[in-house]
């Protein structure tokens, strides 16, 4: 018997032992079931072996070709935002007991993790104005799709209405989920950048399980949710709001407006951009829908000595208890990202999130004024906005962004990528990190393009 060392790369002796175990004489014999015409008939072009030092240098040279936001000024948003993250956030989440912790199935040894998630749930509940929150979802898009399934389950209806002012990527994920649930997805066009209310009145009906709108919407505009809520509930459908958490520091919460479910992406709550993820989705709802919620829920209880403790609760909803009747088949969550959000919210506090929201609002409106004053760039929509707005130009947005990148600036999102009717329209985002000098420089560069 050959002694195999799992921490060493595979040796020829290891290879022989494995082939012998499965009854094969060679690698060629192992792969003979694969047609020769689709098999690589040459060695992989990996180059010569390298030492650790050489590998680090090679990979470092590749990494140097990238640019990060310590080198660039970002006016790009469209769902992911360059907010400031206090250094204490990363310091706390990097502690090994949080960073490497697994699912806290054993509460007696997981009280720290469970309490942290419980605090996260409490803060998201307060922020959204809802009654209950789960321990997190994969991202905002999956949270939205899970909310739609909740609505279908609760109403026993098979149609979801979603506004086209909802993030296009979120709508794609929604359609994928609903396709396999055999649920109809009806998209409503926008009218001047907001949900077309008259069209909503036409398409909503007795088979509508829910109406999904974004707040503020993908174009940065604040939708008239009061009117949408009235139309939705008149048909006994549910209102699902896809929300950006930072504006909730000063805007009315989904709970105050009358939403049944509030979902969103928690990237803005202390999570970096990370080349697209991982982020976290949050899902908050009413007490009435508690037992229909997907994912994990941490609850507060007392132990045999009467001391406060935390446990995973209402687990009969989950697939590891009863797969066929589970509220969803989500089998994990993003607890580390949720912890990040909790640390961020605890660090900045109620006044802090209001301050962040106000700075985003004020800087966006200052930028709107200076970027449109010459008339070269015109507003795409005439509606109230929060921290993002769209500008019309007579030039190709991709070409503008290419020139801005040469000047160390990440330009706006090209809306034509998702909306054919919005050719040469750029969506710009402004967070609390942007300065007057950076905005003025953006104006100067755009004016000469």
Curated annotation (Swiss-Prot):
<dbReference type="InterPro" id="IPR020581">
    <property type="entry name" value="GDC_P"/>
</dbReference>
<dbReference type="GO" id="GO:0019464">
    <property type="term" value="P:glycine decarboxylation via glycine cleavage system"/>
</dbReference>
<dbReference type="InterPro" id="IPR023010">
    <property type="entry name" value="GcvPA"/>
</dbReference>
<protein>
    <recommendedName>
        <fullName>Probable glycine dehydrogenase (decarboxylating) subunit 1</fullName>
        <ecNumber>1.4.4.2</ecNumber>
    </recommendedName>
</protein>
<dbReference type="InterPro" id="IPR015421">
    <property type="entry name" value="PyrdxlP-dep_Trfase_major"/>
</dbReference>
<comment type="function">
    <text>The glycine cleavage system catalyzes the degradation of glycine. The P protein binds the alpha-amino group of glycine through its pyridoxal phosphate cofactor; CO(2) is released and the remaining methylamine moiety is then transferred to the lipoamide cofactor of the H protein.</text>
</comment>
<dbReference type="InterPro" id="IPR049315">
    <property type="entry name" value="GDC-P_N"/>
</dbReference>
<dbReference type="InterPro" id="IPR015424">
    <property type="entry name" value="PyrdxlP-dep_Trfase"/>
</dbReference>
<keyword id="KW-0560">Oxidoreductase</keyword>
<dbReference type="GO" id="GO:0004375">
    <property type="term" value="F:glycine dehydrogenase (decarboxylating) activity"/>
</dbReference>
<comment type="similarity">
    <text>Belongs to the GcvP family. N-terminal subunit subfamily.</text>
</comment>
<comment type="subunit">
    <text>The glycine cleavage system is composed of four proteins: P, T, L and H. In this organism, the P 'protein' is a heterodimer of two subunits.</text>
</comment>
<dbReference type="Pfam" id="PF02347">
    <property type="entry name" value="GDC-P"/>
</dbReference>
<dbReference type="GO" id="GO:0009116">
    <property type="term" value="P:nucleoside metabolic process"/>
</dbReference>
<dbReference type="InterPro" id="IPR015422">
    <property type="entry name" value="PyrdxlP-dep_Trfase_small"/>
</dbReference>
